[in-house]
């Protein structure tokens, strides 16, 4: 069972993408996106500027993961990450991982698990130890900037990456 929704945007009706996602929900197992919890990360259930409800679960929002053919699940590292998680999102941890939690994350990565790590430079203290394993560190500066010459999409705006020099 699935739903073909109308959306809270200027188009209202589903496009081919949303119709296809609804059909896929009927005939196949959808990719599952896990969001790490337990360390003060951005919340997938709360509605707010700093949380991810709109991006994950919001049914009237056309571009939510739910409407684009993904299942979403919260993941706690106190136990091994389920094998059906296709990508794990770590969104701005505010406390460090315990050794057993780190082991569970390492096991997920070792079996080929995918990660998406999101952070702001002021979270360096907790994020840098995790990022260091991948040869990455947080540095001050802007790496995403909206440009006036790019037309805005009515429902979603995509920033462009820029070099630190601004060119």
Task: Name each region found by the language model.
Residues 1-167:
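Short, surface-exposed patches at the edges or C-terminal ends of soluble domains, predominantly
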């Amino acid at each position: 069972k699935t739903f073909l929704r109308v959306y809270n945007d200027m188009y209202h009706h589903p496009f081919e993408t949303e119709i296809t996602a609804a059909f896929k929900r009927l005939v196949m197992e959808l990719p599952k996106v896990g969001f790490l919890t337990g360390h003060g990360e951005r919340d997938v259930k709360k509605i707010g500027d700093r949380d991810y409800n709109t991006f994950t679960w919001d049914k009237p929002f056309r571009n939510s993961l739910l409407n684009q053919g993904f299942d979403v699940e919260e993941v706690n590292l106190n136990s091994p990450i389920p094998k059906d998680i296709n990508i794990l999102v770590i969104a701005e941890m505010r406390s460090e991982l315990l050794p057993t939690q780190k082991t569970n994350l390492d096991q997920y990565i070792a079996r080929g698990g995918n990660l998406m790590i999101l952070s702001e430079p002021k979270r360096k203290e907790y994020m840098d130890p995790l990022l260091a394993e991948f040869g990455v560190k947080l540095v001050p500066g802007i790496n995403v900037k909206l440009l006036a010459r790019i037309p805005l999409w009515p429902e979603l705006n995509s920033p462009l990456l820029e070099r630190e020099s601004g060119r």
